């Protein structure tokens, strides 16, 4: 207490200066320790431990040995394997990465827990060893993955060659679609040996069972191929296994005259059809006229097939001269008629004198009936669907029509009614009158006045289409 105020202040200043000096010295010593620790860590990073070196050498040696063994085991395919791609990790890059990791780890340890790790050198050494081991394992895994990727395409290239290792002689009854035959021979076999041609070529049952894989069938195919390729202008006898299709193909190749005959037949059939229609003859008339003229009766179906080119080549060749002669006779008869126009009367009056008149009869024209006459016929049909011969004569005289036309109209009308109403009995010999409602006429529409004449009132329905008179 005997000290003055100024002395107390001086003592406090001296104590503060002493504290500051101690703090500065402690900080300097701490900095020196930090620098020494960093140098030790860097030296550890540069000098790798022998255990880590041994592990890295083992991992690098194993992929090299595996690559050598794989190269020795796999045969050369013609394509050299690509070299191993570099991993992109040099020694300098590895050291820099490790140094950065160590610095960051040391700073993190000092900031978070300065008292937890009294000796940070051991922690940094442990971290360095772990990082080196992880890096070596990563490199080994990358090399193994690259080797597997390189071995996959080589294995896929070798797989297709295994399909052709089985011999063909062990399976004589194998179907052609399932047999592993070369693709280049398939179009030739498809052209020369169709499946249905074995029986047609005259082969037995034992040879018909054979497939293209058997030796005997292959010999027959070789014989057919050599015979077709060495064919000259004169046809040679083919082997027993030659098919009908191959024979026809060789004939068409050897005789170009047949192709011209086919073209001529096609053109003649077209011309014949046009001339026949222009002259007014039907296909049935042509067949009948040819029977009368030349003694060969032909049906309408035969003439139709000739015009449509649906007959065989031989039948077409046999039929062509007869039709050509008939066409010439028809043209000459047209030229002899008055004014050069076709006249059916000139061909029907002299049937016994001139051969041109026996060409056949012409089809009658379609008979057209007026609406009023058709209405009267419908009314008569309602009253009696099957009139007698006398009733037909009276009706034809009253309507000023031909008796044959009226008779044919009633026949056609009965057939039409059968199609419309199948339950009605129109074949009764008495010809009973039918109800007017069955034909769509009301009872008021029928008027039986005017001396027995059948008339149709204005309210009756009419059919405006023409009725064809049959023959």
Curated annotation (Swiss-Prot):
Biased composition (Low complexity): 165-180, 197-230
Native organism: Drosophila virilis (Fruit fly)
Zinc recorded as keyword: no
Highest taxon of the lineage: Eukaryota
POU-specific domain segment(s): 257-331
Principal localisation: nucleus
Molecular-function annotations in GO: DNA-binding transcription factor activity, RNA polymerase II-specific; RNA polymerase II cis-regulatory region sequence-specific DNA binding
Function recorded in the entry: DNA-binding regulatory protein implicated in early development. Involved in neuronal cell fate decision. May act as an octamer-dependent activator of transcription.
A GO term from the CC aspect: nucleus
Biased composition (Polar residues): 186-196
Name of the protein this chain belongs to: POU domain protein 2
Subcellular location, record wording: Nucleus
DNA-binding feature ranges: 362-421
Alphabetical UniProt keywords: Activator, Developmental protein, DNA-binding, Homeobox, Nucleus, Transcription, Transcription regulation
